[in-house]
Amino acid sequence: MSEIRFDGRVAIVTGAGGGLGRAHALLLASRGAKVVVNDLGGARDGTGAPSSEMANKVVEEIKAAGGEAIADAHGVDSAEGGEAIVKTALNAYGKVDIVIANAGILRDRAFHNLTEEDWDKIFAVHVKGSFNVVQPAFRIMRQNSYGRIVVTTSNAGLYGNFGQANYSSAKTALLGFASTLELEGAKYNIKANVIAPVAASRLTEDVMPAAALERLKPELVSPVVVYLCSEECSVSGNIFTAGGGYVGRAAIVESKGAVLANPTIEDVRDNFTKISDMTGAEEFSNAFDEVQKRLMAATQTGASA
């Protein structure tokens, strides 16, 4: 089969100064994309003065390999920063076709020690940061009737993790974000998907043993992300997991449940096994489809408040 190429496409990769973002940017550029390499250059917890040093190094790597890229050091945690990142792409290359929202920080603490600042900063970078960059790019994609968006969740966002109530919550928020982009972008050939990577990076270097990190190279995740950014990708609103050579799909599903007319507390207790049984669980494409299921149950039982 033919090689997947990105000639003529313009991509923005946030948090691309190292780790996953760097790997994504290098792979896109190697396949012909013009890449905006965005990285604030701060510390892992989001502190430190902005610097383009990390982004510049990745741009140098791309150019040395014959690719085309430009560095950007704006922060994603403000609307002005997001607009500026997109303007960097427009000024350099005239359009935006692809956004990989990868920028992230960590401020891990056990829940009882978590501060409001720790909570707010994580949401500012991961959730608002994705919004700040994707929205101005999305407007351009609508005008051009083409776009590919990949936002980055985490297995912590899917399943939770000790000491990461802020991070897990922010990463879960991005699932609903991407699902809505799928619905609103469908008419304009905009595909939005979610990646849940497990990879060695600044964010994981002291979380996993060195032997495990060696097997979890970012380069093993990037082919999945870059495929989702390609014209050949036909799916949208999906969650994919990747790491260590494993690639899978995750989904939010709902059990068949139990239909209970005007249920009492005891009815819930007596049917709890059936309610909780995930055999034959269903996946819904949007919120309305799930509501329809409940309305059908209400019609069958004649339930009332």
Predicted segments, located by residue:
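Canonical Rossmann dinucleotide-binding motif of NAD(H)/NADP(H)-dependent dehydrogenases/reductases
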Residues: 3-37
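A glycine-rich helix->loop->beta "capping" turn
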Residues: 6, 65-68, 88-101, 107, ...
